[in-house]
Regions:
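Residue-level signal for threonine
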Residues: 19
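Charged interaction scaffolds used for protein-protein
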Residues: 1-10, 24, 28-47, 64-106
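Short, hydrophobic/amphipathic alpha-helical patches that form generic packing surfaces
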Residues: 48-59, 91
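Well-ordered beta-strand scaffold positions
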Residues: 12-14
Length: 106
């Protein structure tokens, strides 16, 4: 089974994964290229951040065979409730993308 993480957002433990499928969902939902994310640094636009979290949660649910009913608006509401959630999600994103870079170099 593919690797996913659990992340706590607004008191809920949610499955999250940033693989190729999540990145494709992100690009489709946001209209942004994944390669452009690095250009934002710490100033990622809210719309882009919501789409990134949404894509990771959607793919985490898919991989873990869990039901996924959240909309992007629901994700935004969860982020409103938990001021540190975006930081936790971005850490998972960085860790998972770092794992992919290491695997490619081997």
């Amino acid at each position: 089974m593919a690797k996913f993480e659990k992340v706590k957002i607004a008191g809920q433990e949610l499955n999250i994964k940033f693989g190729f499928n999540a990145l494709a969902v992100f690009e489709k939902e946001s209209g942004e290229s994944i390669s452009g994310l690095g250009n934002y640094g710490e100033n990622i636009p809210i719309r882009v951040a919501i789409c990134l979290v949404y894509a990771g949660l959607k793919d985490g649910a898919r991989i873990s065979k869990s039901e996924f009913k959240l909309t992007k608006e629901d994700v935004a509401d969860l982020l409103d409730e938990d001021g540190q959630a975006l930081n936790r999600v971005m850490k998972v994103f960085s860790d998972m993308m770092g794992d992919k870079k290491k695997a490619v170099r081997k």
